[in-house]
Structures are given as structure tokens and as C-alpha cells.
Amino acid sequence: MTDKTYKIAVLPGDGIGPEVMAQAHKVLDAIEKKHAIHFEREEHDVGGIAIDNHGCPLPQSTVTACEESDAVLFGSVGGPKWEHLPPNDQPERGALLPLRKHFQLFCNLRPAQIHSGLEAFSPLRADISGRGFDIVVVRELTGGIYFGQPKGREGEGANEKAYDTEIYHRFEIERIAKIAFESARLRRKKVCSIDKANVLQSSILWREVVEEIAKDYPDVELSHMYIDNATMQLIKDPAQFDVMLCSNIFGDIISDECAMITGSMGMLPSASLNESKFGLYEPAGGSAPDIAGKNIANPVAQILSAALMLRYSLGEEAAAQDIENAVSQALAAGELTADLAGDKPALSTAEMGDKIAQYILNS
């Protein structure tokens, strides 16, 4: 039987991006050996390195490569070297935002969990974190108050005012809700939709549409929660949640709260998808220029981003689970990079990649 072939645009970027991406390559190599899958991978410049080599943070050659691929595996962009540039020309705003817009990536998926053996890194009490924390935040990324019109400032003195507009169309809510329910089917089959339907008209529509979509997923349990209560419940009893479905602004808040509960940004992957399930996959953390090139960065977020790519864009669930299980095995065995090791011996970035790849091959 011939291997299935997928074309992946690999954009390592700046800072720790290239060294953690090298570990994702090792893991994908291991997946190729274990499964009947082949990845055609091409690396392209993005962010600061693209400014240096091409004069802009997102060269057309990189965009074209992404268009011709099944998915994009993204590292990180930015650093002090480019901070003097006008904001729209800096790596972050000049690369990531245009990519999201070009590919109409309306859905952001942010998994967050406390891995076995790492409970001490969570700021939650041990009796709370010990009950488990394993959540996916499904955030609508292109609508809502960040993009709604009108927005602006006018007037002066005591009458000066500023305004933003929260707008959601039915189709925007329908498509994000479907992804939340489909994600829940791959997990524990629970969706909690976050809104403010006791106050906001946009949230009333949100709740109505989510309930309509839920009828197509009778195997998934739907609940609703107001955003203010949700932020409290995440601290009080995070184990109750599985998939949290959020508007843009509420998802922005909730996903960062979930990240802090885990205790390590170096562990958190992220996916941004469009309607055809084409996706951009990246670590939730930044480019960490202060530790770049030192071989000490935690590559787990980049590796888990590759697992999300396999699950959501390529439909290779077994391979995705192999990566996630290998990460869990390494962490449970106390194989940790410097950000987690404390006073124990730490693995280098490259050693961590080697360990996880080996666990995949041994499974």
C-alpha cells in the first residue's frame, strides 16, 4: 500500500522557532516510520528572518507555498532586532495577522491540560489540580467586538467618547459551533458555550444558534455559562469542562486563563482553521529571543502543534494520539526541559525531541 502524502509548509520564524521546529521534524519523521504517512516538508521564511532576507515579514513566496500545502506548521516570530520598525511592518503584525486574514482562519483551538507529574506548576491548590484539567477552548477569531463596525473616537472634553461594536452573524456562530461539537466528539463529548445572554443581544443570538446546532449532535452534551461565572468556575472546578465554545473576546480571556492554570506556556499548542479545515499550527508562547540558540527551550508546544495538525487538517487521529501519548510518557518519566526541571537535571531542546520521537517508535 502506498503511503498517504501530505504537503506541509514549515515556517520556523525567529527566536527559538527554528530549534523547536527541528524537534517537530524529528517527531514527524518518527510518525512516517510508524504509520503509512509521508510528509513533504518545505521550510520558508516568515517574520524577522523574512524581513532580513526579503525586505518584508511575509514574502509572496511564503504565501504561495502555504496555498499549495495541506497545512502550515508555524514556529514563532519577532524579537528586539525588529522593534524599531513601524507596527504594521513588525514580524508579529506583518506576518501572522495577514496569514490569518488571507486564509480566512476563523477558528482558534487552544488545548490546555495539566500533565501527570506537573501538577505542582499549576497555581491551583493540589486538591483542585489533582482532579484533572484537560480543556480545549474553541474561540471565534474573525468576528465580534475586535472587528465590528462602527468603532472609533470622537468629540472632546467631557463629551469625548470611544466606541466598539460587538456584531455576530448567524453563519459565523454556526460554523464555530460545528467545530466545537466535532472537537467534543473526539474527546469527552461535552460542550460548554460561554456567553453573556443575560445582557447582550449578540449573546442571545449566540445561545439560540448554538442550541440549534446542538440538535445535529445528540451524542454531545451542551451546557451554557455566563462569562463571569465561567472565569470563576475555571478556578473552582476546572475538571467539569471539556470543550469551551467562546466568542472572540471571551475566548481571548478564557484561553489565557486556561494557559495560566497549566503553569507552563512552553507546553501549549494552538490551531487556527478555516472552513475547509486548512489550518495554521503554532505554539501559544512567543519567540523567547532571550533563550534563542541556547538549546534549552521547551519544544513540547511545537510538537503538540504538529499533533493538532494531524488531527484537524489531515484527519490522522491515531498519529496525533501517538504524539500526545509520547509527550505524556516523557513528562511522566520526569524527562523535562529547563523551564520545568527546577533543580533536577534538565534535558536540552534536542534531547527532548529525541526522547519523544523514541517513545513514538517504541509504542
Curated annotation (Swiss-Prot):
A Pfam family matched in the record: Iso_dh
Stated role: Catalyzes the oxidation of 3-carboxy-2-hydroxy-4-methylpentanoate (3-isopropylmalate) to 3-carboxy-4-methyl-2-oxopentanoate. The product decarboxylates to 4-methyl-2 oxopentanoate.
GO molecular function, one term: NAD binding
GO cellular component: cytosol
Catalyses which reaction(s): (2R,3S)-3-isopropylmalate + NAD(+) = 4-methyl-2-oxopentanoate + CO2 + NADH
Descriptive protein name: 3-isopropylmalate dehydrogenase
Main location: cytoplasm
Key word DNA damage present: no
Site description Important for catalysis, residues in chain: Y146, K196
Lineage: Bacteria, Pseudomonadati, Pseudomonadota, Gammaproteobacteria, Vibrionales
Annotated NAD(+) binding sites: 79-92, 286-298
HAMAP family per record: LeuB_type1
